[in-house]
Amino acid sequence: SVLFKQVNYYIDTPDFKLKEHRSALRIRVKDNQYEMTLKTPAKVGLLEYNYIVDIKPEMNLIISNDNLPDDIRQIIVEQFGVKDTTLSILGALTTYRQETKYKGDLLVLDKSEYFDTTDYELEFEVKDYNQGLQKLQSLLNELNLEHHQPLNKVQRFFKKKETLSNNIN
C-alpha cells in the first residue's frame, strides 16, 4: 500500500465569485511541484485545466490575473468577470492518502485537514460500477460502516470557509 500527502490551496474572490459559477481554482503542492487547476462545470462532470506554475502558495496571497495561465485567465476574466487582484488564497486542505488494492480494484482512504476540521473519506476506484458497488457494500458490512454520499472536498472546504467568514461579520 502507498501513503502520500498533498496540499491543495483554494483560490477565490472574497465574495466567492468562482464558487458562484460552480467552479474551483486551486494550486496543488505535490512532490515539490505547483499545479494550478481550474474546474468548471461541463455537460457531464467537470472540465479541468491543469498547468504547472511558479506561484508558491501561501495564505492570503493575492494572485494577479497576469500570473494566471492564459486559458484560466480567459475563463475567469471573460466568463466570470473576475477583476484583477481580487483573487487570493483562502485556505489550504491537506490530504493524507493511503491506497491499497482490494479485490482487484483500488481502495483509497483520505484524511483531510482544513481550518479546524479533520474528516475521512473512503473511495473505491473501480473498473465496473455494479461489481464495484457489490464489493464496496460487502466491505462496509464487514467493517460495520454505513455509506453516506459526502460533499466533495472542495464543497466541504468552502462550506467551512463560509461558516467561518460569517462568524467574523
Feature names for model-found ranges:
Residues 1-169:
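Phosphate-end processing signature that detects enzymes handling 5′-triphosphorylated RNA
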